[in-house]
């Protein structure tokens, strides 16, 4: 099930409560102190984990919820799995694409771009795509195969130039513009007609897009953020009212946890 409205707010509140209640378990950074602060309270679990061999840890690295560990681990693992479960977005067929479209794009990156594009099912047919922090604009060019206009914003002038050449080679109506999206003049690049997209926009970059797109009156956008720790502030700055009301304050170290897991 795709969470929206009241269901999304309920899930957020449950997840927030879970993280606040058990922050003594997840906040301490591993490998920074000989004994973790929670070991005295959960002595049996701590002893069990310390008996595990490196080979066992490597074998179970990608399936931590399946560990046959003592309490309170099983209950916490089940609840964490429930709260992190997400519905599968519907997808669409992209149709036949020019072979040149994926030239010079690493295979893994092209898979991510294609998977992102397949799940963009906007209620309104986009008339003008805006590829935020676009690099060479591979995502934007894929989306613009329907004949829509395309604007790509990128900070690196070499990527801007390379992207413009690729778009011209495919005869697309695309403009590749050099832009620092964190600069004061970035908002002038967005208008209500744009359908902004951002794939792997790190930290402040995706937050900046959300703010500017909202201010510009963009009716729809799609963002796949990453690297939440790459922000200028010392703590995460929430945008939604429920998140701002939370007592949980996430530091840069807290925001690095997903990266540490991988």
Residue ranges, per PLM feature:
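Conserved SAM-binding motif I beta-strand of class I
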Residues: 149-154
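Intrinsically disordered, low-complexity glycine/charged-rich regulatory or linker segments
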Residues: 1-100
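Class I S-adenosyl-L-methionine
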Residues: 1-37, 175, 182, 188-262
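Conserved alpha-helix/loop element of class I SAM-dependent methyltransferases that forms part
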Residues: 110-125
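Conserved glycine-rich SAM-binding loop
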Residues: 108, 133-135
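Conserved class I S-adenosyl-L-methionine
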Residues: 126-133
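Conserved SAM-binding loop of SAM-dependent methyltransferases across substrates and taxa
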Residues: 136-148
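Conserved SAM-binding loop
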Residues: 163-164
């Amino acid at each position: 099930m795709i969470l929206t409205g009241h269901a999304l707010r309920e899930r957020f509140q449950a997840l927030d409560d879970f993280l606040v209640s058990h922050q003594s378990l997840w906040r301490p950074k591993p490998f920074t102190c000989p004994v973790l602060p929670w070991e005295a309270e959960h002595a049996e679990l701590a002893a069990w984990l310390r008996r595990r061999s490196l080979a066992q840890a490597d074998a179970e690295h990608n399936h931590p919820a399946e560990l046959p560990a003592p309490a309170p681990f099983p209950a916490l693992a089940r609840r964490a799995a429930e709260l992190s479960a997400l519905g599968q977005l519907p997808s669409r067929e992209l149709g036949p694409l020019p072979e040149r479209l994926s030239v010079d794009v690493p295979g893994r990156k092209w898979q991510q771009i294609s998977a992102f594009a397949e799940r963009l099912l906007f209620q309104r047919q986009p008339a003008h795509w805006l590829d935020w922090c676009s690099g060479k604009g591979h995502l934007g060019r894929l989306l613009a195969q329907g004949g829509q206009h395309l604007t790509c914003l990128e900070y690196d002038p070499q990527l801007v130039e390379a992207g413009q050449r690729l778009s011209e080679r495919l005869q697309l109506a695309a403009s590749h513009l050099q832009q620092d999206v964190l600069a004061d003049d970035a908002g002038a690049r967005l208008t209500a007609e744009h359908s902004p997209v951002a794939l792997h926009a790190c930290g402040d970059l995706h937050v900046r897009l959300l703010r500017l797109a909202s201010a510009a009156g963009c009716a729809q956008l799609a963002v796949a953020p990453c690297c939440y720790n790459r922000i200028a502030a010392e703590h995460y700055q929430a945008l939604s009212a429920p998140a701002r009301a939370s007592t949980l304050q996430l530091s840069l170290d807290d925001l690095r946890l997903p990266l540490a897991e991988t």
